[in-house]
Swiss-Prot record:
The lineage of its organism: Eukaryota, Fungi, Dikarya, Ascomycota, Saccharomycotina. Has a role in the initiation of DNA replication. Required at S-phase checkpoint. Its main location: cytoplasm. Pfam families: Drc1-Sld2. Coiled coil: none annotated. GO terms for molecular function: DNA replication origin binding; single-stranded DNA binding. PANTHER family: DNA REPLICATION REGULATOR SLD2 (PTHR28124:SF1). This is DNA replication regulator SLD2. Residues 150-159, 416-429 have a biased composition (Basic and acidic residues). Keywords: Cell cycle, Cytoplasm, DNA replication, Nucleus.
Length: 459
């Protein structure tokens, strides 16, 4: 193919120029750059024309193959132009409008043209829509009679889209069954005719009701729930049995009203059957008053021994008193339990909320001197001071004498050691130095000055 060789040569020359331009300018050439150089512009133009011709020839060949494959599809192509004429017209149009196309290259292309889901080629100018089914050769159009009349009247050159005919819509409520029941297996046309006739005549429709007689005739009650069955009705009297027999006789009658009234009047709630307990098999008699049941709680005592003990209890008065005391204590305990139960029902006792203690609780001794009368009210102070001094001197002398006595006892080994009584009359009111070792933290002594100040600050 000479066209294919020339196209490849033109393509190579264009690519060489594009690469050189990109190296020199560091960008891809645009349309304005192509139009600046006339030689390059001619190369692009000739390449485009040759490429279009080759594409047209390929499309014609593809179309011929499709026509040979789709012989069954009835497409009216008699009025369309032949392939050769279309190619010639297309070439003429391309040669005439080449300059116009170069000017309008900047415009955007529209969507791809399609018809009946198939992409249209350049030659599919007057493609008529095919019929919906390619397997059946239909006579006339695929629309209604109104469209066929319009097609006969319209000229053959023009093609018009078929219009939809108006169809009377049918409400689903019109297809509901009526009281006049017919055969169930109706066709669709019969149902539609019935709905249209019901719409015209406006017959009142009602909800269908069940046939109670047929239901009662086909009704079968299980044996354990039957009205005549007295297997599980343990508490029924003779009157109820008579009523059940009457119901059984009425069920055999032909009148439906009698059957319904008797069933409604004598309905008995079904009782769930329960399994009866198995009989207890005792090897001995189950009497609770047997001696081995009464007195065999951990000891195998005889009845005679228990009787003798009872006699001894009656004769001994101490045992009787102790038993009575135990009974009274048990009664008191029972009373306490009842009181506790009563209080428990009233609700749990809550501890009273008081002020929280933030400091240490000290032991405060009462001040007894304030309660007594003032002894020095009518006394001479100087005399009292002298008495105190004399007592202090006397105590000191006694203390010194006691120490001297201890020293003499240590020196004389022959004499026996006599233990001094701490509660001796001579030692009363004197300081005991041994006890001073054990006196610690005496902060609450009312005779101390700090304690008195602390009490005054609290007031």
């Amino acid at each position: 193919m000479p066209h294919q060789e020339s196209i490849t040569q033109l393509k190579q020359a264009i690519k060489v120029w594009e690469h050189e331009f990109q190296r020199s300018n560091n960008r891809i050439p645009s349309r304005s750059d192509i139009k600046v150089d006339p030689k390059v512009y001619e190369l692009y133009k000739t390449y485009k024309v040759l490429k279009a011709k080759t594409n047209n020839v390929r499309n014609i060949q593809d179309k011929r193959t499709l026509e040979s494959a789709n012989i069954g599809i009835d497409i009216n192509m008699s009025e369309s132009q032949s392939d050769a004429e279309d190619v010639e017209e297309f070439n003429n149009e391309n040669s005439d409008s080449s300059n116009n196309k170069l000017k309008n290259q900047d415009t955007e292309l529209g969507p791809t043209p399609q018809a009946n889901g198939k992409v249209l080629s350049i030659l599919d100018i007057r493609l008529t829509p095919p019929d919906s089914s390619p397997l059946k050769n239909k006579v006339g159009s695929r629309s209604t009679d109104t469209y066929s009349n319009q097609k006969d009247e319209a000229p053959e050159d023009t093609f018009k889209t078929p219009t939809k005919t108006r169809v009377n819509r049918i409400n689903l409520s019109e297809l509901t069954p009526t009281n006049n029941r017919g055969p169930r297996n109706k066709s669709l046309m019969q149902k539609l005719e019935q709905a249209s006739s019901a719409k015209n005549t406006r017959i009142e429709m009602h909800t269908p009701e069940r046939n109670k007689v047929s239901l009662l005739q086909n009704m079968e009650t299980p044996q354990y729930l039957a009205k005549v069955n007295n297997k599980f009705n343990f508490d029924m009297d003779d009157d109820s049995n008579d009523k059940d027999n009457v119901v059984a006789e009425d069920l055999h009658t032909n009148s439906s009203m009698k059957i319904i009234s008797s069933i409604r009047s004598n309905i008995i709630d079904p009782i769930t059957p329960t399994k009866s307990p198995a009989p207890l098999k005792f090897q001995v008699s189950p009497s609770p008053l047997k001696p081995h049941r009464l007195f065999s709680f951990g000891n195998n005592r005889k009845l005679s021994d228990i009787f003798n003990d009872y006699k001894n209890i009656k004769e001994d008065p101490d045992l009787i008193n102790s038993i009575e005391n135990e009974e009274e204590a048990a009664e008191l305990d029972d009373d306490d339990d009842t009181i506790e139960k009563d209080t428990a029902t009233n609700g749990p006792k809550r501890k009273r909320i008081t002020q929280k203690r933030t400091t240490r609780r000290w032991k405060i001794k009462p001040n007894t001197e304030e309660t007594k009368e003032d002894k020095l009210k009518n006394a001479n102070i100087h005399d009292e001071v002298k008495k105190l001094d004399d007592e202090a001197r006397k105590n000191l002398v006694d203390y010194m004498e006691v120490n001297n006595m201890h020293e003499e006892d240590e020196t004389t080994s022959e004499e026996e050691y006599v233990h001094q009584d701490p509660n001796h009359k001579d030692m009363k009111g004197k300081v005991k130095p041994v006890r001073m070792n054990y006196q610690r933290l005496k902060i609450n002594d009312p005779r101390i000055k700090k304690f008195k100040k602390r009490m005054q600050n609290r007031r």
